[in-house]
Amino acid sequence: MLIPHDLLEADTLNNLLEDFVTREGTDNGDETPLDVRVERARHALRRGEAVILFDPESQQCQLMLRSEVPAELLRD
């Protein structure tokens, strides 16, 4: 299920983005400050390049590139 980022409270969205950009495997040795990485992710959401996907089975949210989301989920 896609979650529209603009419907989330500002703090909730920020916490979600911080969680995503600090997950193991997302920094790839990048020494970019946390606030810059969060803003990059936020900008990708605003441009429509990324989406927030909620998996009800695992109760987890993922930030994904729109191009990587299965087409059937984008139609919902």
UniProtKB/Swiss-Prot annotation:
NCBIfam families: PRK00304.1. This is UPF0270 protein PA3463. Pfam families: UPF0270. Gene3D superfamilies: YehU-like (1.10.10.610). Belongs to the UPF0270 family. HAMAP family: UPF0270 (MF_00690). InterPro entries: UPF0270, YehU-like_sf. SUPFAM superfamilies: YehU-like. It comes from Pseudomonas aeruginosa (strain ATCC 15692 / DSM 22644 / CIP 104116 / JCM 14847 / LMG 12228 / 1C / PRS 101 / PAO1).
